[in-house]
From Swiss-Prot:
The lineage of its organism: Bacteria, Pseudomonadati, Pseudomonadota, Betaproteobacteria, Rhodocyclales. PROSITE patterns: ATPASE_ALPHA_BETA. It is a peripheral membrane protein. Its EC number is 7.1.2.2. It comes from Aromatoleum aromaticum (strain DSM 19018 / LMG 30748 / EbN1) (Azoarcus sp. (strain EbN1)). This is ATP synthase subunit beta. GO terms for cellular component: plasma membrane; proton-transporting ATP synthase complex. InterPro entries: AAA+_ATPase, ATP-synt_VA_C, ATP_synth_F1_bsu, ATPase_a/bsu_AS, ATPase_alpha/beta_chains, ATPase_F1/V1/A1_a/bsu_N, ATPase_F1/V1/A1_a/bsu_N_sf, ATPase_F1/V1/A1_a/bsu_nucl-bd. It comes from the Bacteria. Produces ATP from ADP in the presence of a proton gradient across the membrane. The catalytic sites are hosted primarily by the beta subunits. It is found in: Cell inner membrane. Pfam families: ATP-synt_ab, ATP-synt_ab_N, ATP-synt_VA_C.
Amino acid sequence: MSQGTIVQCIGAVVDIQFPREAMPKVYDALKLENAAGSFAEEGLTFEVQQQLGDGVVRTIAMGSSDGLRRGMKVASTGKGISIPVGHGTLGRIMDVLGRPIDEAGPIEADELRPIHAKAPKFDELSPSVDLLETGIKVIDLVCPFAKGGKVGLFGGAGVGKTVNMMELINNIAKQHSGLSVFAGVGERTREGNDFYHEMKDSNVLDKVAMVFGQMNEPPGNRLRVALTGLTMAERFRDEGRDILFFVDNIYRYTLAGTEVSALLGRMPSAVGYQPTLAEEMGRLQERITSTKVGSITSIQAVYVPADDLTDPSPATTFLHLDSTVVLSRDIAALGIYPAVDPLDSTSRQLDPLVVGEEHYNVARQVQVTLQRYKELRDIIAILGMDELSPEDKLAVSRARKIQRFLSQPFHVAEVFTGSPGKYVPLKDTINGFKMIVNGECDHLPEQAFYMVGGIEEAMEKAKKLQ
């Protein structure tokens, strides 16, 4: 175990000098000497980012750098950051270094795995076309998820990314008998606490492993915490299991990379992001994949800065996803939740060969009707409904019913709305929208379709309104 001394501290970036012949490798973990003169596991950890030459390495502190000073002793562990994986992590909350933060004693791990690993080889990958039912109408209809696929929830501030993710966890993780891993990357600590209690109250805590590196953590922690969660998910996948991997929020991962890049003195690229943005994103996303042994289905929340989907961070994330669920501020302003934009959201699974002719045709008819309404909105605003042709009046009437029928009460929002959450099976979703586009519901008032589950519930509500 080679030892070095701190020669410079600039915030989270620390330069450490080692003997020339014993310089640590890039991504090696280093430990700080404690007051007792030992290099304890719970002490401050550094990760090597650059070798500057002459025995000096530039590192990022994986914790607060308060109290560091020049001349302090640091030891190389000779390997990268390794974390406990396996069944001992289920029901536990860990930090980026795999240390428990739930005050429930040490974690009994099957093994320790390094967080830096190569993506599976091309011949080990396994494509998947099986659909994953979510019980959320708008998602199942226009942007269906694939088992073993990658899904992104895109949205600006306050349009419901985390609530949608919590509902997906509620509907999938509880129905799905497999295991889940949740990585909280740079988000609010309160949300992590809510998530933990939600899982505990639902009695599924023993099927979930959680890792958090929240907003108050240094950039090194936020940059690596997604890899920690992914390493845990990979271990379960390699056992032949189907894993759900939730990440909230991928944008904070990018942002932490930007902070680290600036601290390391790299020249920024477009909009101030790090020059290695595409490579860093690819390194994470290429590992989130399904092999012939097991699958990882990943659902990632992606914050969209200033609601601009062309921003380099969300734009780079788009490339890696199978389904994109775009949350719209305009739809949220109408009071329609989930505020998913059915015209902007896409999925590779929405193909007649995968979902079947009926599902595909209904979804496309819904989109065509909503698109026609969008085109007519300006005319309606200027001239009013009376100036439209009978066909257009009918299209607008159906579109407004579809728009309201795309809303749905959530289980996780019951405490705020007072209305019980609804899980809608896929066949009921297709049947409901098919009836609306075919004109079988033209006689019903549009208010009857707002915040209901299936079409039968809308009909019951219509009877009460009449």
